[in-house]
Amino acid sequence: MYSDFHNDILTYRSGELPKEYYDNNIITAVFRGNRSFKDALKLAEKAVLPAFEDVGYEDLDIDELLRIKPLYVTLTWNGENRFGFGCDFDSDKGLKPEGKAFIKILNENGIAVDCAHISKGGFKDIIESAENVVNSHTCFSALHKHKRNLDDWQLDELA
C-alpha cells in the first residue's frame, strides 16, 4: 500500500522533505511552485516513489523526467500552462495540442496522468487519451461544490 502525502506546503515552502518521505513507500509529489524543473528534479530524484504536480515547466526536459519514471504527473495546476487549462477555466477548455502529445509519451512510458486540478474539458481529454489515470487529491462536488471537486460523471469515468 502506498500513501500519497504530497502536501504542497511541505514541498513548496521548505524546499526539502523530512527523511522519512524518501525512505518509505510514500509518494513524494513535487509541486512546481516557483521552482525550475531542474530544482524540482533534485527533490524528486531523492524520492522512492516520485510524482510531479503541475509538470508544465518552461524548462521541462522530458528525457530527464522519463529517466526518474514518476508514478504520475499532473499536467496543470489551477491555471493555464503549455499543456492545458486548470480548473480556474471554463469547462470547455481542455488540453492543448502539446498536452495531448505529452500524454502519448506518458502512455508509452507507463506513467499515469493525474487529473487533480485540471479543467472539466481537460478531464475529458485525459479520460479519452491516457492509459493510466489517477486522481490524487480531489473531493466530491456532491459533498461541497468547488471548482476542483469532481462531479458524479467524473467519478463514473474514474471507476
Regions found by a protein language model. Name each.
Residues M1-P97, A130-V133, S141, K145-A159:
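N-terminal hydrophobic targeting/anchoring segments and the immediately downstream early-domain regions
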Residues D92-I127, V133-T138:
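Loop-centered beta-sheet repeat module
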